[in-house]
Every structure is written in C-alpha cells, then in structure tokens.
Amino acid sequence: MANYLDFEKSIKQIDDDISSAKIRGDDSAVEILKKNLEKEINKVYKNLSEFQRLQLARHPDRPYSLDYVRALLKNYYEIHGDRVFRDDPSIVCFLGYIADKKIVVIAEQKGRGTKYKLKRNFGMPHPEGYRKALRVAKLAEKFSIPIIFFIDTPGAYPGIGAEERGQSEAIARNLFEFSDIKTPTIAIVIGEGGSGGALAIGVADKLAMLSNSIFSVISPEGCAAILWKDPDKSEAATKALKITAEELKELNLIDDVIKEPKMGAHRDKDAAAKAVGNYIIEKLNELEKIPLDEILRKRKEKILNTGVFEEL
C-alpha cells in the first residue's frame, strides 16, 4: 500500500479508481484511468514547491543508506567502532566493491520502523559516530581507497551526553580532516541534509544531491520557531532557506543533481539505486584520471570559494 502525501491526493483518487475498475473487470475504464493518472502525475510533479520536496525528502518509504549499500555493493564488509567510546549505529561504514572498484562507504542511517529508528537514533549521530567515520576514512586513505559518503540526517544528536563527549569538536575535526584527506571522495545527499550533522561527512571532491533531497543549515521548523516564534511558519521558512537541490546547484554549493524516478526515489527504489550507482561510477572514473595533488588542490579551492564573507 503506497503512502500518499497531502499534495498527492488527486493521484491517490485516480489510483483508487483504477483499483475499483480492475475489481469490476472493466478493462476499458482501466486504460482510460491510466492515461488520466499519467497526466495527473505530470501535472502535480511539474512544479513542486520547496515544501513539497521537503515532504518527499522525509517520506517514510524513501530508500535509506543501507538500501543503497545492499543494492550497489558486492562483497562488502561492515566496519564498527570509533576505538574511543563505542559503536554508533547512526553511522554505518563498509568496505566493498562497486563495478569492480574497491570503495569505502560512510553513511548516515535513519532506520525503518520503531525498533530500528530507536537503534539508529533516528539518523542523528553521536560524536562517536563521526569519530568512527573519521577512523574508517583514515583507513581508506592509508590504502588509497576512494570514499563514498551517503548523507541522510535531520542533524547531529543534541543530547547532553553527546555534548559532553564533544559533539561540536567531532564535527569540526571531520571538517578539518576531510578537507585534506588524501584519497578521492564523493558525497551524496539521499534524503535530509541537516546542518552540521550533514556537513560532518559532506566535505568531498564531488557533492551531489538526489533531486528531491534537501540540504539546510537548520530544519524549517527550527527556523520558523526562531524567526517567527511560530513552527506553523515552516512552509515559509522552507522557501526562504533555499534547501532544494536545484537552488543549491544554482548557488554553486553542490556539484550535481541526480534525477530521481517519477514521484520520488521511494516509488522505484531499483531505478533510484541505479541512478546513484551510475553517478558514483562516472565520478570515480573522472577522479581516477586526475593526480592526487590536483584533486587536493581543487578540493581546497572549492572549499575556499564556498559562501560569501567580508574581511573586517
């Protein structure tokens, strides 16, 4: 049973009509309704608002990092622990192969269903998760293995324990280390890219977003609560924040947009995985042809050209 979003009500109605026509055995009605459905889908998805893309990015059926790992990697092996405090299940790390290319995957995992959402802390990493990511990245650097980051988090965990164990230091350390790690890196936002929680594994040679994913300095709800003292203003905040892939590409804050299947990645997970896999292979092939010194120079140049600042 498909989970329909609020703006998909007209699509749901036609889908329901098709199901009823099939039960009646009315083949001619089914064919007509299928054509109407195609038109309605094109109409609804032609000009999605920022808030609608936010809803798609948070869709409960959207493929998570482990879905992409299982679909794309062969002979993969999970790597656990930060060797300092504990293993954080919100960050998952793998050594494996994609199209016969050896890679390391470092990813944020939200978890599906109550049990696994709690296990993965809803995709909000603790500092030990980011330290695990750095430990595994350093291992990849040692053996000259490219790193693929999958970003999907509402943000780093803001709990007391996380702060006591140095959440801000862990994020800052990753920003520092990943800006100069001596191996090719590719980061892909597959759902939510929430603030520092996303940036902590988001410094890379190539940064891409799925077309219905979002990347923001703060959640729209948090922004609305701060600016307007009203969480109900989240739709206006979504528009003001410029969080969509297209907007961030126009601002030169990301490198590429990976097109999702019609109606979102959750509607065709195999097609979504194929698109992500093709992107990874294409960019790995590009980076393999560039000397490491040049990769590092371009990465540093890219970081220094990000954003706007004034020197006082």
Swiss-Prot record:
Gene Ontology biological-process annotations: fatty acid biosynthetic process; malonyl-CoA biosynthetic process
Protein name: Acetyl-coenzyme A carboxylase carboxyl transferase subunit alpha
Keywords on record: ATP-binding, Cytoplasm, Fatty acid biosynthesis, Fatty acid metabolism, Lipid biosynthesis, Lipid metabolism, Nucleotide-binding, Transferase
Alphabetized InterPro entries for the sequence: Acetyl_CoA_COase_a_su (IPR001095), ClpP/crotonase-like_dom_sf (IPR029045), COA_CT_C (IPR011763)
CoA carboxyltransferase C-terminal domain location: 25-286
Cellular localization per UniProt: Cytoplasm
Main location (coarse class): cytoplasm
Quaternary structure note: Acetyl-CoA carboxylase is a heterohexamer composed of biotin carboxyl carrier protein (AccB), biotin carboxylase (AccC) and two subunits each of ACCase subunit alpha (AccA) and ACCase subunit beta (AccD).
Family membership noted in the UniProt record: Belongs to the AccA family.
Enzyme Commission number, as recorded: 2.1.3.15
Gene: accA
Gene3D superfamilies membership: 2-enoyl-CoA Hydratase, Chain A, domain 1
NCBIfam families: accA (TIGR00513), AccA_sub (NF041504), PRK05724.1 (NF004344)
One Pfam family this sequence matches: ACCA
Catalytic activity annotation: N(6)-carboxybiotinyl-L-lysyl-[protein] + acetyl-CoA = N(6)-biotinyl-L-lysyl-[protein] + malonyl-CoA
Domain of life: Bacteria
Biological pathway: Lipid metabolism; malonyl-CoA biosynthesis; malonyl-CoA from acetyl-CoA: step 1/1
GO molecular function per UniProt: acetyl-CoA carboxylase activity; ATP binding; carboxyl- or carbamoyltransferase activity
GO cellular component: acetyl-CoA carboxylase complex
Function summary: Component of the acetyl coenzyme A carboxylase (ACC) complex. First, biotin carboxylase catalyzes the carboxylation of biotin on its carrier protein (BCCP) and then the CO(2) group is transferred by the carboxyltransferase to acetyl-CoA to form malonyl-CoA.
